């Protein structure tokens, strides 16, 4: 009995030691400091990278704890039910971050040392998260612009379904009601159309009207593709799919132009020429998106297969 008791005591002590070691290792991924707004250094780099891994932080990983990092921390704390939602990164927040994310330190530090533009999102291979060289960017842009100049007869004609714009003598309210009645296709609800308009407004306001229709068309093309979710909301809110969702602009009030662009896309106008992807060449950092076969450029966006 004494021997068995000794063995049990040793097992308990061993378990306690292992648990303590694991918890210590978990915390030690960061230093012991409480990270807060205004902080700089490696702790902040890791913080930003881990937050970006799960999509909470979409800014530059630069080791400077500014307002963007602050709100990302608060959103993370709130999402995971932490007691303190205050932007202060103490032991509990660090533990939760380590549990819910990954940090590829060597990759991040290499990119910072080289001065590269890069990201650290989860579920995307790291080799696709470093912005290509200026030479590669310029070459791809020139190719897209060259293709844009080629005749594309199938997209130059706008469908006649939008001919109601010439009815200037009809009251605006009546025209709006007529457009909804005439253009609302089966299978799309008012909520679908509003959500599409919010996405178009968040992604492409200020772009040429053709470019706004093209954004709506890309969403519809994804809806019809087996590679993407089978609902409007599913496509739009798919993780990392749209910048407007990541930065909250999806919730802005869309204007009538965005709504009209959605209706034109639903009625068959596809200036994107069946594109499934698009990106802004001035801000895109992913070699993966740059490597997609490019169809054309409209305004600030390049549309891809």
Curated annotation (Swiss-Prot):
It is found in: Forespore. InterPro entries: Cell_wall_hydrolase_SleB, Peptidoglycan-bd-like, PGBD-like_sf, PGBDSf, SleB_dom1, Spore_cortex_SleB. Residues 142-156 have a biased composition (Basic and acidic residues). GO terms for biological process: cell wall organization; spore germination; sporulation resulting in formation of a cellular spore. Residues 158-172 have a biased composition (Low complexity). Residues 1-29 form the signal peptide. Could be a lytic transglycosylase. Required for spore cortex hydrolysis during germination. Interacts strongly but noncovalently with spore components. Belongs to the SleB family. B.subtilis SleB could not be detected with anti-B.cereus SleB antiserum and vice versa. This is Spore cortex-lytic enzyme.
